[in-house]
Amino acid sequence: MIPDVSQALAWLEKHPQALKGIQRGLERETLRVNADGTLATTGHPEALGSALTHKWITTDFAEALLEFITPVDGDIEHMLTFMRDLHRYTARNMGDERMWPLSMPCYIAEGQDIELAQYGTSNTGRFKTLYREGLKNRYGALMQTISGVHYNFSLPMAFWQAKCGDISGTDAKEKISAGYFRVIRNYYRFGWVIPYLFGASPAIFSSFLQGKPTSLPFEKTECGMYYLPYATSLRLSDLGYTNKSQSNLGITFNDLYEYVAGLKQAIKTPSEEYAKIGIEKDGKRLQINSNVLQIENELYAPIRPKRVTRSGESPSDALLRGGIEYIEVRSLDINPFSPIGVDEQQVRFLDLFMVWCALADAPEMSSSELACTRVNWNRVILEGRKPGLTLGIGCETAQFPLPQVGKDLFRDLKRVAQTLDSINGGEAYQKVCDELVACFDNPDLTFSARILRSMIDTGIGGTGKAFAEAYRNLLREEPLEILREEDFVAEREASERRQQEMETADTEPFAVWLEKHA
């Protein structure tokens, strides 16, 4: 089932320097909660400055949903320490609140208890909150409080030059974009390995369903927890953030121009379902528009092609201008065993897997094959640790045992690890392979099995509160290592100044501005 990459691996072993200079970045979301595990109802902590313009700390859907962002970094340890500094400073500046350590939200009785993220009075800030109002009215607020980790990854120019010859200009843009689309197609075919190893959301509070019926065969505990005994990541299931109306958009990952055209079409395609919500009610705007996507970011995807946007530029226009610059991996649950929600082992594994995805052949995929890849993902998400579980290839009927496929993949990853270790020194990548491959013969070692044992023991609330308390105490005590207190104070002040400048620079009323942007 795993494509034969022996030739590509042999090529890599002859060109190890092609992997020197991999760049990465991390984003981590987390809900602010009270000591009793309920959602914090306070505004964004003052010490963190403006959520609209802060370089490192912002908010996602809700005012209580923090998001930490590291700068692009070539050094794993430095990046993780930077992320830890963001957590340390925040833990010291959020009063008695703490950070929820799980992907699925804390106990929230009602969706209306969730305040949307607020970004001030500038047109841009109000637009961001209106977008969230639209998300709430389309999908429900609870679903939007699910949190995850995003891992951004780019291969060095040396890799593309070794692989494609001396490239520049439009040629480079097209060849590099084609190379990243290969990564994306392989990710859709084999990325289920990520929730298998690192999925950590096998259970939910019953309140999360809001009384809606579900076809999933949940087991229930006395304390109101619903779980699936072999599930890995309910966050990635249909309970999580998926968008049924997006499934027939037909967006594919074979070609830059095709992909962008599909995305641009989706933000112009009217939706009957969302038209029923209405645009305005009693003088209050309910969504930006009633199209399938309000804006491009609404497209749900476990992985995204990206380029840093310029001022006023949409994500797709940035891609058209310069091609794909990096890949955003979006399938990581919060790691509950790390105070910062992600650890070195995971980052090193993702490095290995992304390189493998760049090397392995990836035939073009039709939108129907793309839909078929969802079958493997769903199996792993809902019953990944079930004995005897099998996976298929695309829409074909042949089936293969998951543990065997996993071990075959790791045989290749081990060779990538040897190459990366040869240029970085040490054996850190090989060690990660040896640790993780054991999860295929012993699923009890996976994150989902480990966290489920704790949840069955003490409930989701008990587990979440215990980890949150321990991490709060730990992070508050640890000294900063890279950033200094004055860096945070300076960024707070600079972010507040930037927000003020945006607010005073606006010349037209929001309603007029919105007509041009909706």
Swiss-Prot record:
Reaction(s) the record says it catalyses: L-cysteine + L-glutamate + ATP = gamma-L-glutamyl-L-cysteine + ADP + phosphate + H(+)
Gene3D superfamilies in alphabetical order: 3.30.590.20
EC number assigned by the record: 6.3.2.2
HAMAP family per UniProt: Glu_cys_ligase
EC class name: ligase
Stated name of the protein: Glutamate--cysteine ligase
Keywords: ATP-binding, Glutathione biosynthesis, Ligase, Nucleotide-binding
Pathways involved: Sulfur metabolism; glutathione biosynthesis; glutathione from L-cysteine and L-glutamate: step 1/2
Source organism superkingdom: Bacteria
Keyword ATP-binding: yes
NCBIfam families: glu_cys_ligase
Family membership: Belongs to the glutamate--cysteine ligase type 1 family. Type 1 subfamily.
